[in-house]
Amino acid sequence: MIENYIQLNKSSILRLGIKTDEGIDTGEFLEFNLEDIELPLRFQELLEKDKKNKEHLRNQMLMIDKREDVKGKKLMSKNEEDKIKAINEFFKKEVEVYNMFLGEKGVEKLLNGRKLGWTSLQEIDEIITKQIAPHLDLKMTNITDKIKNKYGEAIQRNKEVLKDE
C-alpha cells in the first residue's frame, strides 16, 4: 500500500497566540493566510463597517440628546436607558464586524472568557491596528509586486509564445 501526502507551503501563515492577563498561554490563536486573496477586501470591509457603525451610534446619541428626558421608573432616565441600549446594539454590531475579519469567535478568543466591557472594543481595535495590520502588507502595489514575482516568468513565456504565432 502506497500512501502519498502533500502539504501546502505555510510560510505565509500569520499565527498569533493568545495569553491571559497573567501571561499564560491559552492555547487559542488567531490565524491569517497572508496570501489570502480576500484578506485585503475583508480588512477594507471591516474599516468601512466600523466607520458606518460609529456614525450610526453618533446619530442615535444626537437624536436621544435632542429629546426631552423623562424620569424613568427605575434607576436611569428614559434617555440614559436609550443611550445604554444604543451602545449595546453598537457593541453587538462591532463584534460581528470584528469576527468577520478575525474569524469565527475571534472576539471571544481575544476576550479570554471575559464579558464584553466598556473598553473591550478599543482593546480589540488596538490589537488589530498595532499587532495584526502591520503584518498584512495590504497595499495594492505590494500585492501587484507579489503577483508579478510569482507569475512574471510564466506571463513573459506566454507573451513570447503568442508572438511566435
Locations of regions flagged by a protein language model:
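Structured domain cores in non-transmembrane regions
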Residues: 53-78
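Short linear sequence motifs
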Residues: 25, 36, 83, 91-94, ...
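Generic alpha-helical secondary structure signal
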Residues: 41, 81, 85, 105, ...
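C-terminal charged interaction modules
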Residues: 92-165
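Long, compositionally biased intrinsically disordered regulatory segments in eukaryotic proteins
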Residues: 3-4, 32-36, 65, 75, ...
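Short, charged/polar N-terminal "headpieces" of proteins
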Residues: 1-62, 149, 153-158, 164-165
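Intrinsically disordered, low-complexity acidic Ser/Thr-rich regulatory segments
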Residues: 72-93
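Extended, low-complexity, charge-balanced
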Residues: 7-17, 21, 84-88, 95-105
